[in-house]
Amino acid sequence: MKYGLCAVDLDGTLLGPTGAAHEADVVALKKLLARGVPVTIVTGRLYSGTRHVAEQLGLRGPVACVDGSHIVSTETHKTLHCHALAGERAIALRDAMAASRAATFVFAQDQVVYDERGTAYLGYVSTWSTSLVATGDSVSHPYWEEDAGVTAVVAVGDRTQIHAAVEAIAKTLGDHAQVAMFPAKNVDERWGMIVRAAGGDKGTALAYVADHYGVPMSEVVAIGDWINDLPMLRVAGRSFAMGHAPEPVRKVVTDRLDHTSLEGGGVARAVELAFGVRAK
């Protein structure tokens, strides 16, 4: 099989724990580009947290951010597609977050808006973007009422606060929102939550990018490591899971890598196996 597009996740896949890409993986992707094979990024990060990696690789084309909710051109830095919560749905989400009193981070217009309650968690949230904007009260920021809506909302709080928010969102937004609740990494005894508009994920975003390049999904290669990568790993013709990926991810892929993001080299190995391009 000849493959025509390579899609790579960032954190935990191309990027290591420090947020930097490993040299061998960068070299492999650049060699792939030099052969005329398009490469794209499909990440949970905002574009502001993705752009420097795209520039490091020399990407020219669409990249998918916020788990597929925001697709941006790396050439113009303009939005190609945005799947946001707007209007009454954004207001309903805002009200649910206000009632929960959890630290609320609003992802909108390629920024993360936070208030005093979120200051302690900036290190955690900066994984998505370092374009952080302080405000007096994040749940009363004008972004909630703008036509563009909000791309996503992340919240951090105790389990009771987050559970209350999840229940309120389910009651008021129902199938219009997708919600994930989880123990917050590196934040002791705190829970996290991310909310996005339903209907968009890494799989739909990858289909958009593949269509942009005129590549059938059967000829797309995807590389990821985490649960949010499942939608793109399921739809790609060939899919790779990093060595540290949890079993639900490893179950759905065509290939399981031994490499982890700690030592790097997983992306380079996937590129070699799928495209015959070696980093060295």
PLM segments and residue spans:
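Hydrophobic packing residues within well-ordered alpha-helices of enzyme cores
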Residues: 25, 50-54, 165, 169, ...
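Active-site phosphate-binding/coordination module
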Residues: 18-127
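Mg2+-dependent phosphoryl-transfer enzymes with acidic/Ser/Thr/Gly-rich catalytic loops
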Residues: 1-5, 22, 195-280
